[in-house]
């Protein structure tokens, strides 16, 4: 058998979106892309919960609480970390990426990583709905596909 994630059958999914307020000029369009994608694929608006956090580092903490609660089928994480002149950029992005991955694996909750890492604000804006598409929408499609595959795997056992 060959299995591939489907973008249908998600009407009853409960989805959490954890989004950073820092760099809101970028994260607000990412959030819009994620919500529009969920709506387009039939997820009931009442089943979408948005959790604003101060910055990218807080994404992991809140995602962990949400995953452990068992209230959500999947989680979308959104943020924008723009490189500066210090090593802070590397510390933040490595911490968030590793943390989100660990939470997903330890709780068996699908969590997709939509935290942009760019050199400039302009690059981030391009990836948040301008010329380079909307990464919030893209990672949300990935989440729906993964949730569908999880369903397929459960049916195998």
UniProtKB/Swiss-Prot annotation:
What Pfam families does the record point to? DMRL_synthase
* Enzyme Commission code(s) on record: 2.5.1.78
Which residues of the sequence carry a binding annotation for 5-amino-6-(D-ribitylamino)uracil?
A: 22, 56-58, 80-82, 113
Superkingdom, taxonomy of origin: Bacteria
InterPro entries, A to Z: LS, LS/RS, LS/RS_sf
Instruction: Give the record's pathway.
Output: Cofactor biosynthesis; riboflavin biosynthesis; riboflavin from 2-hydroxy-3-oxobutyl phosphate and 5-amino-6-(D-ribitylamino)uracil: step 1/2
Q: Which residues form the active site?
A: 88 (proton donor)
GO BP terms in the entry: riboflavin biosynthetic process
Q: Name one GO cellular component term.
A: cytosol
| One MF term in the entry's GO annotations | 6,7-dimethyl-8-ribityllumazine synthase activity
Residues binding (2S)-2-hydroxy-3-oxobutyl phosphate, per UniProt: 85-86, 127
Its UniProt entry gives the catalysed reaction(s) as: (2S)-2-hydroxy-3-oxobutyl phosphate + 5-amino-6-(D-ribitylamino)uracil = 6,7-dimethyl-8-(1-D-ribityl)lumazine + phosphate + 2 H2O + H(+)
Keywords attached to this entry: Riboflavin biosynthesis, Transferase
Protein family membership: Belongs to the DMRL synthase family.
Q: Which NCBIfam families match?
A: lumazine-synth
Which function does this protein serve? Catalyzes the formation of 6,7-dimethyl-8-ribityllumazine by condensation of 5-amino-6-(D-ribitylamino)uracil with 3,4-dihydroxy-2-butanone 4-phosphate. This is the penultimate step in the biosynthesis of riboflavin.
Record-given protein name: 6,7-dimethyl-8-ribityllumazine synthase
**Source organism (scientific name):** Leuconostoc citreum (strain KM20)
Q: What is the lineage of its organism?
A: Bacteria, Bacillati, Bacillota, Bacilli, Lactobacillales
């Amino acid at each position: 058998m060959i299995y591939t994630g489907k973008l249908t059958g998600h009407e009853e999914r409960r989805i959490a979106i954890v989004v950073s307020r820092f760099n809101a000029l970028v994260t607000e369009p990412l959030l819009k892309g994620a919500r529009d994608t969920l709506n387009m694929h039939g997820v009931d608006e009442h089943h979408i919960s948005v959790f604003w956090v101060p910055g990218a580092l807080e994404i992991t903490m809140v995602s962990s609480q949400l995953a452990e609660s068992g209230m959500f089928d999947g989680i979308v994480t959104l943020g924008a970390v723009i490189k500066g002149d210090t090593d802070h950029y590397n510390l933040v992005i490595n911490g968030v990426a590793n943390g989100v991955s660990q939470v997903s694996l330890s709780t068996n909750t699908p969590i997709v990583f939509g935290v942009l890492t760019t050199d400039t604000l302009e690059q981030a804006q391009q990836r948040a709905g301008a010329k380079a598409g909307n990464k919030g929408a893209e990672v949300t499609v990935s989440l729906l596909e993964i949730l569908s595959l999880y369903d397929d795997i459960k049916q195998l056992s």
